[in-house]
């Protein structure tokens, strides 16, 4: 069964509505700002109220050391920067005593991947002994193109930990699931107005579609 992550949650009400309905709830903390970014303490307060779903701190625009220090109190740290496999191993070792798992990101620029092509990256992570919570395929910020589904399918054959993001909506759920990824990650696609405020009906449509198409 595919897992579902709804990311970029800014309001406690949205987080509580999603608790137990999705596998992961993501809170973005970006030092570069952004419409879905929240202060670290606000993210921690929301995460502390979540009882069933796993909480993910998505850190962008910071060093690995800052991200590791910020991750205490969350279930997963998603370091949303291209991260070399050796650096991922170091970051994972820092997080292990906290009981926090690491999620890494491979960014699609429209013509290339950062830090490298997904299957090659997965192979290098394996060599370093890194076992991430998931390996998220996402688009570079500002890119209008989506990740080609055949590329997601190729990556999913290299690891059972691959997740797919990058502008997905509830209508895309089945096509995303058909690539074989283990996780779909949606943010803006379940919003109708204010960034970070998740629409309950769109969220339900996404969840039901993902589960139905992967059952």
From Swiss-Prot:
Its EC number(s): 5.3.1.24
Reaction(s) this enzyme catalyzes, per UniProt: N-(5-phospho-beta-D-ribosyl)anthranilate = 1-(2-carboxyphenylamino)-1-deoxy-D-ribulose 5-phosphate
Entry-linked Gene3D superfamilies: Aldolase class I
Pathways involved: Amino-acid biosynthesis; L-tryptophan biosynthesis; L-tryptophan from chorismate: step 3/5
Domain of life (superkingdom): Archaea
Pfam families: PRAI
Annotated keywords: Amino-acid biosynthesis, Aromatic amino acid biosynthesis, Isomerase, Tryptophan biosynthesis
A GO molecular-function annotation: phosphoribosylanthranilate isomerase activity
GO biological process, one term: L-tryptophan biosynthetic process
PANTHER family: N-(5'-PHOSPHORIBOSYL)ANTHRANILATE ISOMERASE (PTHR42894:SF1)
Record HAMAP family: PRAI
Family membership noted in the UniProt record: Belongs to the TrpF family.
Listed name of the protein: N-(5'-phosphoribosyl)anthranilate isomerase
Organism, as annotated: Aeropyrum pernix (strain ATCC 700893 / DSM 11879 / JCM 9820 / NBRC 100138 / K1)
Source lineage: Archaea, Thermoproteota, Thermoprotei, Desulfurococcales, Desulfurococcaceae
């Amino acid at each position: 069964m595919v897992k579902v992550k709804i990311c970029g949650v800014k309001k406690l009400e949205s987080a509580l509505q999603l608790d137990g309905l999705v596998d992961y709830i993501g809170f973005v903390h970006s030092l570069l700002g952004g419409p879905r970014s929240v202060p670290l303490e606000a993210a921690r307060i929301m995460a502390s109220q979540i009882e069933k779903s796993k909480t993910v701190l998505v850190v962008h625009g910071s060093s690995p050391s800052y991200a590791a220090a910020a991750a205490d109190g969350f279930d997963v740290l998603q370091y949303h920067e291209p991260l070399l496999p050796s650096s991922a191993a170091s970051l994972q070792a820092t997080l292990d005593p906290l009981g926090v798992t690491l999620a890494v990101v491979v960014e699609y620029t429209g013509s290339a991947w950062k830090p490298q092509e997904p299957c090659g990256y997965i192979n290098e992570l394996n060599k370093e002994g890194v076992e991430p919570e998931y390996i998220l395929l996402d688009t570079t910020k500002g890119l209008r193109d989506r990740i080609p589904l055949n590329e997601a399918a190729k990556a999913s054959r290299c690891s059972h930990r691959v997740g797919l993001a990058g502008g997905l909506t509830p209508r895309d759920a089945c096509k995303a699931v058909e690539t074989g990824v283990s996780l779909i990650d949606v943010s803006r696609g379940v919003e109708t107005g204010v960034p970070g405020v998740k629409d309950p009906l769109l969220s339900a449509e996404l969840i039901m579609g993902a589960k139905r198409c992967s059952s």
